[in-house]
């Protein structure tokens, strides 16, 4: 049986997964490629609002998924290698299958 703490940990994991999936949906890793960009540049290239993109990028930094230095964001070697469309090792297929099943329990009500 899961403890209260275990259940809260699972909820936290879901929140982190949703942050990563949102970054993939907006092609954040491909927009960054090997570049160093400010949040306003990423927002412009992804056609998103600056405030929301700043929150997303900073959440990714807090999770260790992106790097940030003086308000400049960059991919980590892992995010470039596997989640950037220009990388020869791009592996988005599995993640996209997971994204397709995100809403499968929304139809319960």
Model-based region annotation:
Residues 1-109:
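N-terminal accessory segments
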């Amino acid at each position: 049986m899961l403890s209260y703490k275990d259940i809260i940990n699972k909820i936290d994991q879901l929140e982190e997964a949703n942050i990563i999936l949102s970054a993939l949906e907006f092609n954040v890793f491909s927009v960054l490629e090997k570049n160093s960009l400010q949040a306003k540049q990423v927002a412009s290239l992804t056609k998103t609002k600056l405030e929301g993109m700043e929150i997303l990028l900073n959440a990714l930094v807090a999770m260790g998924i992106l790097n940030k230095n003086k308000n400049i964001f960059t991919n980590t070697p892992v995010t470039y290698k596997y989640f950037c469309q220009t990388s020869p090792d791009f592996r988005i297929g599995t993640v996209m299958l997971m994204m397709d099943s995100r809403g499968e329990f929304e139809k319960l009500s």
